[in-house]
From Swiss-Prot:
Its job: GTP-binding protein involved in protein trafficking; may modulate vesicle budding and uncoating within the Golgi apparatus.
Keywords: ER-Golgi transport, Golgi apparatus, GTP-binding, Isopeptide bond, Lipoprotein, Myristate, Nucleotide-binding, Protein transport, Transport, Ubl conjugation
The organism of origin for this protein: Saccharomyces cerevisiae (strain ATCC 204508 / S288c)
SMART domains linked to this entry: ARF, RAB, SAR
Glycyl lysine isopeptide (Lys-Gly) (interchain with G-Cter in ubiquitin) cross-link, chain position(s): K127
Name of the protein in its database record: ADP-ribosylation factor 2
Positions annotated to bind GTP: 25-32, 48, 70, 126-129, 160-161
NCBIfam families noted in UniProt: small_GTP
Keyword Nucleotide-binding: yes
GO molecular function, one term: GTPase activity
Lipidation (N-myristoyl glycine): G2
Similarity remark: Belongs to the small GTPase superfamily. Arf family.
Gene: ARF2
InterPro entries: Arf1-5-like, P-loop_NTPase, Small_GTP-bd, Small_GTPase_ARF, Small_GTPase_ARF/SAR
Subcellular location: Golgi apparatus
Length: 181
């Protein structure tokens, strides 16, 4: 009841809340993305074993972002975070060509999850500052994003350390949240 009243109150006064699940393979830059958005700075990170959760304010939307560790042995725990997720940010290490197939498999499994059927999908093609980074177009093709027909999706080139592209991604999320409301 409290969550319902909070959402109703927020909607009446123009503020919205959006629950975001941020996932991706280990080392993709999820935690760096989260704290660049939250604090505006790059922090020293260690591999996330559990999760980090922060609220990021953008325009009139309060994004509650759950950054969940990406190591293979803890990915089975991701499903515990699916409930009430309105948006997924899937972070890709654009420089890691050897694991793009693994990222595709992980993403495809998530796309088949019933609890995520109404979530919008934002892919951050991260680490674009590195010289061998795959372009957003190449990642789109390798992930098979064009085959996603049942939900809104978008890919955004990003560099978490500089912040490049991060707010453009939040802009897309905020516009798609409005379309779903």
């Amino acid at each position: 009841m409290g969550l319902y009243a909070s959402k109703l109150f927020s909607n009446l006064f123009g503020n919205k809340e959006m629950r975001i699940l941020m996932v991706g393979l280990d080392g993709a830059g999820k935690t760096t993305v989260l704290y660049k958005l939250k604090l505006g700075e790059v922090i020293t990170t260690i591999p996330t074993i559990g999760f980090n959760v922060e609220t990021v304010q953008y325009k009139n939307i309060s994004f509650t972002v759950w950054d969940v560790g990406g190591q293979d042995r803890i990915r089975s725990l991701w499903r515990h975070y699916y409930r009430n997720t309105e948006g997924v940010i899937f972070v890709i290490d654009s420089n890691d060509r050897s694991r793009i197939g693994e990222a595709r498999e992980v993403m495809q499994r998530m796309l088949n999850e019933d609890e995520l059927r109404n979530a919008v999908w934002l892919v951050f093609a991260n680490k674009q500052d590195l010289p061998e980074a795959m372009s957003a177009a190449e990642i789109t093709e390798k992930l098979g994003l064009h085959s996603i027909r049942n939900r809104p999706w978008f890919i955004q080139s990003t560099c978490a350390t500089s912040g490049e592209g991060l707010y453009e991604g939040l802009e897309w999320l905020s516009n798609n949240l409005k379309n779903q409301s």
